[in-house]
Amino acid sequence: MKDSIIAKLESLKERYEELEALLGDVSVISDQDKFRAYSKEYSQLEEVVKCFNRWTQLNQNIEEAEILLDDPEMKEMAQMEIEESKAEIEEVEQQLQILLLPKDPNDEYNCYLEIRAGTGGDEAGIFAGDLFRMYSRYAESKRWRVEMLSANESEQGGYKEVIVKVTGEGVYGQLKFESGGHRVQRVPKTESQGRIHTSACTVAVMPELPESEMPEINPADLRIDTYRSSGAGGQHVNTTDSAVRITHIPTGIVVECQDERSQHKNKAKAMSVLASRIVQAEQERQAAEQTDMRRNLLGSGDRSDKIRTYNYPQGRVTDHRINLTIYRLDEVMNGKIDELIQPIITEYQADQLAALSEQN
């Protein structure tokens, strides 16, 4: 491992030990803001410091074993210790490099998940409902909270559009690579000839930004309409105009929220989604102007980019970005999507490592 990386790790370890002492200080404990900030930083450093401590211990094991190589009775055991430690060091160094990669500051945020039916008519709406259930079950397995913000149901079941907020630890970092075009190939229930149809939905994942990071939005740039909430399946229909539709005139972005009975709450939620969409649109514009490793992985960053195909007759799911195919479609649609999500994250980290190696 390079001296510069070791120096960086030693610096992080010093800070970790400093924070450990601070968290035991009475003056810090009595200051909630300081204690919360130090606790968060301490938690963020914990994994990398433990990993570095293991690396240090393994190197120490090798040094001690090398001394025993001159002892005929201990030579074989010492040689084994050296080989095992060197093999583990390789794994630990790889882990350390990943832990030191620049973090996306948005990764720890909650997120907004939007699913829209695309080509395919009623079948696309049904597939949008299938994707919504898939993500909801995945969120449930992670103990995340899913909050419905807006739903436009389609006539044959499913949704023309559904927007939810997902709350939990590291939500955006786990789901951000789900943005893009999702395609389904199957025989619709209404198909009498048994022909396979292809339909599509687009998924967009955006971080929920804290107030300090929200863009300034000029009220004069907004058109706000109110209307009566349709309710879920005709139930609990509001008799007041509590649903809110906000149009950002300069960008043409439209956000609707009808989940709450209070117009004020719906407006606040819609404004939060609007802010995230404006930031996302700007980021996509910048990504279109430059080619980098994230753009290579996510395609052009356009939500219509086809990223995944769900083929029902073959029981397979294919992620086209990394040419990954798995034959457990039923499990995937029931929310077991870690084996699709984790390889993409790993590939992204590998791209980052490769880029850093080129820079160095």
UniProtKB/Swiss-Prot annotation:
<dbReference type="GO" id="GO:0005737">
    <property type="term" value="C:cytoplasm"/>
</dbReference>
<dbReference type="InterPro" id="IPR000352">
    <property type="entry name" value="Pep_chain_release_fac_I"/>
</dbReference>
<dbReference type="Pfam" id="PF00472">
    <property type="entry name" value="RF-1"/>
</dbReference>
<keyword id="KW-0648">Protein biosynthesis</keyword>
<keyword id="KW-0488">Methylation</keyword>
<feature type="modified residue" description="N5-methylglutamine">
    <location>
        <position position="235"/>
    </location>
</feature>
<keyword id="KW-0963">Cytoplasm</keyword>
<dbReference type="InterPro" id="IPR005139">
    <property type="entry name" value="PCRF"/>
</dbReference>
<feature type="compositionally biased region" description="Basic and acidic residues">
    <location>
        <begin position="285"/>
        <end position="295"/>
    </location>
</feature>
<dbReference type="InterPro" id="IPR050057">
    <property type="entry name" value="Prokaryotic/Mito_RF"/>
</dbReference>
<dbReference type="GO" id="GO:0016149">
    <property type="term" value="F:translation release factor activity, codon specific"/>
</dbReference>
<feature type="region of interest" description="Disordered">
    <location>
        <begin position="285"/>
        <end position="309"/>
    </location>
</feature>
<comment type="similarity">
    <text>Belongs to the prokaryotic/mitochondrial release factor family.</text>
</comment>
<comment type="function">
    <text>Peptide chain release factor 1 directs the termination of translation in response to the peptide chain termination codons UAG and UAA.</text>
</comment>
<protein>
    <recommendedName>
        <fullName>Peptide chain release factor 1</fullName>
    </recommendedName>
</protein>
<dbReference type="InterPro" id="IPR004373">
    <property type="entry name" value="RF-1"/>
</dbReference>
<dbReference type="InterPro" id="IPR045853">
    <property type="entry name" value="Pep_chain_release_fac_I_sf"/>
</dbReference>
<dbReference type="Pfam" id="PF03462">
    <property type="entry name" value="PCRF"/>
</dbReference>
